[in-house]
């Protein structure tokens, strides 16, 4: 369970107009913050150890699902609240981009095979309890075979029961990264690729130095934030022209919940595995067999799919599995710990950080119980 929130910062002087801001880490948070600050007229420099493609970012591998009710089974109420916030905030953020990014809110479908019905019953009870406890979560819909077929015609006669979680969504993370890169170019952000940095490289506020430093490096910040750890995820991308799904589908499994997230043009992102490890070696044979076998049991059309990618990445995770913002020096903010919920909670962390910079305090962080602390 989460600990009590750390008291918010003492009020800080708002960021002056046309301030110079250095951002470390061009993953999801770093790009979002760079774009927002540049649009407000600040002079932004973005540093990253990898390339513009974001090949070192956990967010590039993710399925980018926005599923607060589904994730309530494995996370805390404040993360669920951040997920509800993100569902409304993402369309506003996407509207600022120079090119369209796939986004939909068709809900989440949960299905299971007959032998896994007891696990599904426990999951249903847990989700129903969470829905009653967290304001704003929609009531799930219990489906029979006809209901599953109506929700996903491609799964007709494949599952006797299912659960539909209305209003949940997803976006295309690869399209988003490209659109953010174009936005940053257009906004005049100075981007430094293959240029690792750490807070000690600058003295913010001194002549010739940035006014603020924002550290969004994920696991790259481990030397300065030693409680960070990596949680390995393994994901397979398939092109399956014979399969059409309208929404992310989760398969109840005795060991883990497998998800199938459909993107445009019959591209599917399949994942589930979560391993306590900093290991970024290629996907294991066991995970490959389990993920592909599970996909085939959901829809036999995956048998003729083509494997486009098999990826691994480690998500930056704090001991309580919750995100945090901390000030490690008078003008240095560190943002980290998005764990497996990156896209679902990034808008809240992004907006809270902007409030801290522009107002000196964050009512949003207090409302969402997002940890903000001095160290």
Annotated model-derived regions:
Residues 39-59:
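Glycine-rich FAD pyrophosphate-binding loop
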Residues 20-45:
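N-terminal Rossmann-like FAD-binding beta1-loop-alpha1 element of flavoenzymes
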Residues 162-212, 216:
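Helical element adjacent to the flavin cofactor pocket in flavoenzyme catalytic cores
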Residues 32-40, 65-66, 101-104, 217-330:
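Active-site substrate-recognition segment that forms the wall
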Residues 99-113, 129, 136-181, 273-277, ...:
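Helix-loop-beta segment of a Rossmann-like dinucleotide-binding subdomain
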Residues 305-375:
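C-terminal catalytic lobe of FAD-dependent flavoproteins
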Residues 22-24, 209-219, 350:
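Short hydrophobic core segments
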């Amino acid at each position: 369970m989460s600990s009590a929130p750390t008291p918010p910062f003492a009020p800080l002087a708002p960021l002056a107009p046309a301030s110079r801001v250095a951002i470390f880490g061009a993953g999801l948070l770093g790009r979002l913050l760079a774009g927002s600050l540049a649009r407000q007229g600040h002079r932004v420099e973005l540093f990253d150890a990898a390339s513009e493609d974001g090949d070192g970012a956990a967010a590039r591998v993710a399925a980018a699902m926005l599923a607060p009710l589904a994730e309530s089974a494995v996370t805390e109420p404040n993360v669920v609240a951040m997920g509800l916030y993100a569902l409304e905030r993402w369309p506003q953020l996407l509207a600022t981009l120079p090119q369209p990014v796939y986004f939909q809110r068709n809900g989440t479908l949960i299905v299971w095979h007959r032998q896994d019905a007891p696990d599904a019953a426990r999951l249903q009870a847990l989700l129903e309890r969470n829905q009653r406890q967290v304001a704003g979560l929609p009531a799930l819909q219990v489906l029979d075979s006809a209901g599953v077929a109506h929700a996903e015609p491609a799964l007709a006669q494949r599952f006797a029961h299912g659960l539909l979680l209305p209003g949940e969504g997803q976006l295309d993370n690869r399209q988003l990264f490209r659109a953010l890169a174009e936005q940053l170019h257009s906004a005049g952000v100075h981007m430094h690729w293959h240029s690792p940095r750490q807070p000690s490289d600058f003295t913010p506020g001194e002549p010739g130095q940035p006014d603020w430093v924002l550290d969004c490096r994920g696991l790259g910040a481990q030397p300065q934030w030693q409680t960070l750890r990596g949680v390995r995820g393994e994901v397979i991308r398939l092109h399956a022209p014979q399969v059409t799904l309208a929404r992310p589908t989760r398969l109840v499994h005795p060991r883990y919940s497998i998800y199938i997230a459909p993107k445009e043009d019959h591209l599917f992102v399949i994942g589930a595995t979560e391993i306590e490890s900093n290991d970024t070696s290629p996907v294991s044979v066991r995970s490959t067999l389990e993920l592909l076998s599970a996909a085939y049991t959901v829809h036999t059309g995956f048998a003729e799919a083509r494997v486009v990618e098999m990826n691994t990445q480690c998500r930056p995770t704090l001991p309580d599995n919750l995100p945090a913002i901390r000030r490690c020096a008078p003008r240095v903010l560190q943002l980290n710990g998005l764990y497996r919920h990156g896209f679902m909670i990034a808008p809240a962390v992004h907006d809270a950080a902007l409030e801290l910079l522009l107002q000196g305090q964050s009512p949003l962080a207090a409302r969402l119980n997002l940890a903000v602390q001095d160290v």
